[in-house]
């Protein structure tokens, strides 16, 4: 009887040979794989909330934002979803998303507000535009006032006008590569009292340049410290006052400002 392999069985030497081949194939896969995968498998997820029953200019800006961020998502491998259903501002529906946007409104019910508070307190990310940050004595949401760095709406210019903006801090990931100043398209600018700059936890990133004053025609802001973009460092958040254009001038039409919008999403979305 000759010695050899028994039919239907694999001896130890063959096991070793197969193992070496598997490891070699895996090494080749790692060597030549370029790291590209579908966004649903790899990229972070963003959910944008917006409303269609608000001021027409707010709706137009939200529609421009949706197109801008869908294009940004396609180019940067993340998932961008959007909804007009603010009831989705709840713990279950927010769970898959690393970042949420409020494009032209804010939550109205206690349940939605409580869900947002929990989401942010547990590491969620937020970018709010224009009226998303609005608060005064009628909104009755003290947590949100603190979240905004203590900033309370005081007044605004009217009509929307373009303005020169100053980049206060170009070391932030949101403002990196921005010019020292740039012209922002027509917008309704909010003045806050107290100013968020007074809060030690707030990092002001962009401010209305004083050379714009007085700004407005019907409603005029004569002077003052007017932060436009800032972050509360206690949270993963950034607020941007842009969001109410007029006279056919679109918020998402300036390259420098668009860079700011893109940087903010990519910064907060990629934060762990």
Language-model-derived ranges and their functions:
Residues 106-178:
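A glycine-rich, often tryptophan-bearing local segment used as a flexible ligand/cofactor-contacting loop or short
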